[in-house]
Amino acid sequence: KQMEGIERRVAAVEEQKKNDEQLSQERETARSRRPENDGLKQLKYQTEDKLDTLRRLQCIPTKRAEDAKKLLEGKRSIVIKGNPGEGKTTMALHLIDNEMYRDKRVVLYCTHDWKTVDTHHVDIVVLEDVFGQYDFDPSRLQEWMVYLPTIEEHVDAGKLRVIVTTRADILSKAYPRLGKLKLFSEDLSLTLSSEQLKYSEKMSILNRQLYRHERNLKEDEKEKCISNFMGLIGFPQCCSLFAGDNKLFDRGPEFFNYPNKFFVANISELEDKRFMH
């Protein structure tokens, strides 16, 4: 009789477990059928608009882009860091411009954007300039720290992929306050640096910007632009600034010697022309 009682209790526990699983599945199905909220629809529209722009620009694929793709596929999350103008945002957009993420990808700029995300309607998110755009912003960090553990749980559960973009100097200031978050561990980070670009990649990037802005430059001058390059602004953005602005283009290869100096001198005008990214 004692054995029969134990068996009945085990059977009851198993039955309860089965009922709980069924109820959980029914709730999950109901959530998956929920329509998208208006905020999420707007974010998706804005994201697709950015991807359309990216495709028109026909950005140059690089070895580093392949490295980023492999890391994202293997780990489900990646932190893309580097100096201004290295192409962090472009890289992030390139990674989500994949048929497997169609209609389920969004770029987020703040925690308010994250609140609109439903993982039944989103497979991948980009957290853009997560801790500040031009300098470390403690208030942004504090806001994101409320949600980053949940985002990490979604990644671990296979419900979401995450791409974080941040300037390297800003991330270094945020590190001490990130606690045990695995999202920002070194093995999930990829640094973009112009020093990593091959000569052929730099030439392709320069040629693409010259073509885009209908500029002509002799081959020896192009070579000087590449060999002269120095500065804290990434080579990709230097090429964009150089080809897109008459004053900077008139400087010729000299611009690439001291792009920071010319950038600061013309920053207001360049911001108006939306060259900054």
Located regions from the model:
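Charged, amphipathic alpha-helical interface modules that flank catalytic cores or transmembrane segments
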Residues: 1-67, 73, 94
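Amphipathic alpha-helical "lid/sensor" segments that cap RecA-like P-loop NTPase cores
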Residues: 19, 31, 35-36, 168-180, ...
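Walker A/P-loop nucleotide-binding motif
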Residues: 74-91
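Residue-level preference for the first positions of well-ordered beta-strands
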Residues: 77-79, 105, 124
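Hydrophobic, repeat-rich solenoid/adaptor surfaces of innate immune receptors and signaling proteins
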Residues: 79, 95, 126-129, 161-168, ...
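Post-Walker A helix-loop "phosphate-sensing" segment adjacent to the P-loop in P-loop NTPases
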Residues: 97-107
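Conserved P-loop NTPase "ATPase switch" module shared by AAA+ and STAND
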Residues: 110-112, 118-145, 165-168
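Substrate-engagement module of ASCE P-loop NTPases
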Residues: 145-160
